[in-house]
């Protein structure tokens, strides 16, 4: 049974609260080029979901949300331990760690058009999580003449600069929601595809359906430290560039030595311009 099939079973045991309902659900494939520890540059793909109505939206990784939901209660944690116990013999036998239930993406983006605010929750590194709010961006779009079809919808090309990257997107006026993946929004139609110039990041819609699914808030909000956007990005970058050293120090602390014996001087790293979705934190 997959993680996503288990989610309704878990949620059915919880007391229902009244949350706003979406009108549309869009699945996106997020392709990312990233720096993986000392291994250098790698690529990966994650599924993200956009739930949206005319006033608010939520962009999130569904598998990660399911695991966050389990981690938010004692019974959920016990259920996760059972799932882990069930796969560990096969993991030990084959060395296939992909069998271990793990998060696929971390960022949650909530847009509230009524209040003109965006709320972002993200993983920083190790046991650190951060969140921030900012005004809903008034992106300056340049709409072009090029067209193409995505998922059967006629789309128009548009471009914008946002927080250090230049984006080319395709939106469809056939779905008049000023929404899109991640923070991208503000066009007279739903954004179904977005790619930034370097090719390090892209979002491509893979499915779309009408829904009345609830837009539920994030699980365990208290674990997210409030901070400014650029501070969060700088801390993510520090963790990325010093991952091995931070892990070794944490290992020392777990052992109780606190000596820092496993800490190392930073290695000479591969020079690369691979970076996050937003790069203006470096200024």
State the predicted function of each range.
Residues 58-59, 155, 169, 192-194:
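Short hydrophobic-aromatic micro-motifs
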Residues 22-27, 153-159, 186-193:
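Short, hydrophobic/aromatic-rich segments at coil-to-beta transitions
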Residues 13-133, 137-138, 144-147, 199-283:
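Extracellular or lumenal secretory-pathway regions
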Residues 3-13:
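Hydrophobic h-region of N-terminal signal peptides that target proteins for export
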Residues 130-173, 178-180:
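Extended beta-strand-rich segments in extracellular/periplasmic secretory proteins, especially
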Residues 3, 43-45, 143, 153-155, ...:
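Short beta-strand-initiation
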Residues 33, 43, 166-168, 177-212:
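Structured soluble/peripheral alpha/beta segments that form catalytic or ligand/cofactor-binding pockets
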């Amino acid at each position: 049974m997959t993680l996503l099939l288990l989610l309704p079973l878990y949620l059915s045991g919880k007391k229902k609260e009244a949350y706003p309902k979406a009108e549309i659900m869009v699945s996106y494939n997020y392709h990312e080029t990233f720096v993986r520890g000392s291994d250098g540059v790698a690529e990966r793909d994650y599924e993200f979901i956009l739930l949206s109505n005319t006033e608010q939206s939520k962009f999130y990784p569904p598998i990660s949300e399911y695991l966050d939901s389990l981690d938010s209660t004692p019974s959920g944690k016990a259920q996760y331990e059972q799932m882990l116990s069930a796969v560990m013999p096969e993991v030990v036998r084959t060395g296939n760690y992909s069998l271990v239930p793990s998060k696929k993406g971390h960022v949650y983006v909530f847009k509230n058009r009524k209040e003109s605010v965006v709320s972002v929750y993200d993983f920083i590194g190790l046991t650190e999580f951060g969140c921030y709010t900012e005004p809903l961006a008034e992106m300056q779009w340049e709409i072009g003449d090029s067209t193409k079809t995505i998922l059967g919808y006629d789309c128009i090309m548009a471009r914008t600069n946002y927080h250090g990257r230049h984006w080319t997107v395709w939106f469809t006026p056939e779905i008049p929601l000023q929404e899109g993946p991640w923070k991208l929004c503000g066009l007279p139609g739903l954004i179904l595809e977005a790619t930034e110039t370097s090719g390090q990041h892209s979002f491509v819609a893979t499915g779309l359906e009408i829904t009345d699914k609830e837009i539920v808030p994030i699980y365990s909000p208290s674990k997210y430290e409030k901070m400014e956007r650029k501070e969060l990005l700088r801390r993510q970058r520090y963790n990325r560039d010093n991952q091995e050293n931070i892990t070794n120090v944490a290992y020392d602390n777990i052992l109780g030595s606190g000596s820092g014996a496993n800490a190392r001087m930073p290695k000479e790293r591969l020079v690369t311009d691979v970076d996050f979705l937003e790069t203006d934190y470096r200024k």
